[in-house]
Amino acid sequence: MHHVVSATTNPAKIQAILQAFNEIFGEGSCHIESVSVESGVPEQPFGSQETRAGARNRVENARCLRPQADFWVAIEAGIDDDSTFSWVVIENAAQRGEARSATLPLPAVILEKVRQGEALGPVMSQYTGIDEIGRKEGAIGVFTAGKLTRSSVYHQAVILALSPFHNAVYR
């Protein structure tokens, strides 16, 4: 059984990680341990580079905290070009896989508050009245009328980032 350390305690992210690992490696093939680690970037990262750095930093910090794991996974959400997206970084002892998620264009009223220094999650909670929306369906769930959720978009990116770990052509 794979010991997978999730560099987050966010339920939406953990669900995506667990579902993707089960789909790739088989149902029940992994145990997810979630840890809270720092990203080393602002709470609301801006740009692809800063967001990816946050995910890489979380993986590095999770590896230091739980060096005995088989995999370390981080999902860092950010804002880029008026849209929200995330970077997924997965490492094992030998390699790294990375993937960027789909992007969701954000309305001007939301972007204005985020650009003033507020994080997207709290802004969306104020807008919708849903407490801790970032730990649930997220802006993605709200603006796609539930057709997608934060977790479903993360799930796809985790699947993509896992590609080097189960396809021999990457080795």
From Swiss-Prot:
GO biological process: nucleotide metabolic process; thiamine metabolic process
Origin superkingdom: Bacteria
Cofactor remark from the record: Binds 1 divalent metal cation per subunit; can use either Mg(2+) or Mn(2+).
First-tier enzyme category under EC: hydrolase
EC number: 3.6.1.73
GO molecular function per UniProt: ITPase activity; metal ion binding; nucleotide binding; ribonucleoside triphosphate phosphatase activity
Residue ranges of coiled coil: none
Catalysis: reaction(s): XTP + H2O = XDP + phosphate + H(+); ITP + H2O = IDP + phosphate + H(+)
Annotated substrate binding sites: 8-13
Cofactor(s) required, per the database record: Mg(2+); Mn(2+)
This protein's UniProt keywords: Hydrolase, Magnesium, Manganese, Metal-binding, Nucleotide metabolism, Nucleotide-binding
Binding locations of Mg(2+): 38, 68
Name of one Pfam family that matches: NTPase_I-T
Purpose: Phosphatase that hydrolyzes non-canonical purine nucleotides such as XTP and ITP to their respective diphosphate derivatives. Probably excludes non-canonical purines from DNA/RNA precursor pool, thus preventing their incorporation into DNA/RNA and avoiding chromosomal lesions.
Entries under NCBIfam families matching the protein: inosine/xanthosine triphosphatase, PRK05074.1
Oligomer status and interactors: Homodimer.
Record-stated family: Belongs to the YjjX NTPase family.
Protein name, entry field: Inosine/xanthosine triphosphatase
